């Protein structure tokens, strides 16, 4: 499955490698992980999804499980706060499967290099085929090779 360039933050990469197998085993999709500096420590945000969406009980359950694993596996993270939530209405699109799932939706796409003099595009996700994503912007189709996309999300 093709995914966009992964996070280069080694802590995020480590958390992703720990969280992904547990999420799959528990029936969740790991959508995104981010770490943000905070007074006296760090906030670790993990965004999860599943068919039908996640509930507050799901968030509590995964916070307990992931928190325990992170505490044991990543001792270098001493002071952190773990937040588990849904990706929400502006969900990031990171895999080709995400684009396929949200065909017909309004999206924002940022290209690695300018296309027609632009980097940022907002339009309707109209096609995913042969490793390419098509977005209709102002009634004009714009085709991105998946590797050309630096960021994308639902709009």
UniProtKB/Swiss-Prot annotation:
The keyword Coiled coil does not apply. It is found in: Cytoplasm. It comes from the Bacteria. Its main location: cytoplasm. Keywords: Cytoplasm, Ribosome biogenesis. Pfam families: DUF150_C, RimP_N. GO terms for cellular component: cytosol. One of its GO terms (biological process) is translation. Belongs to the RimP family. HAMAP family: RimP (MF_01077). Required for maturation of 30S ribosomal subunits. PANTHER family: RIBOSOME MATURATION FACTOR RIMP. This is Ribosome maturation factor RimP. It comes from Desulforapulum autotrophicum (strain ATCC 43914 / DSM 3382 / VKM B-1955 / HRM2) (Desulfobacterium autotrophicum).
């Amino acid at each position: 499955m093709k995914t966009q360039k992964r996070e280069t933050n080694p802590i995020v990469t480590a958390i992703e490698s720990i969280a992904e197998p547990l999420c799959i085993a528990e029936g969740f999709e790991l959508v995104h992980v981010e770490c943000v500096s905070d007074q006296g420590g760090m906030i670790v945000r993990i965004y999860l999804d599943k068919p039908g969406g996640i509930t507050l009980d799901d968030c509590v359950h995964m916070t307990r499980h992931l928190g325990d694993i992170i505490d044991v596996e990543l001792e270098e993270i001493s002071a952190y706060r773990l937040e588990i939530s849904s990706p929400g209405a502006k969900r990031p699109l990171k895999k080709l499967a995400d684009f396929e799932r949200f065909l017909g939706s309004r999206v924002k796409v940022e290209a690695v290099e300018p296309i027609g003099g632009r980097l940022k595009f907002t339009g309707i996700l109209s096609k995913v085929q042969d490793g390419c994503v098509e977005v209709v912007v102002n009634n004009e189709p714009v085709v991105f090779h998946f590797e050309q996309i630096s960021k994308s999300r639902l709009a």
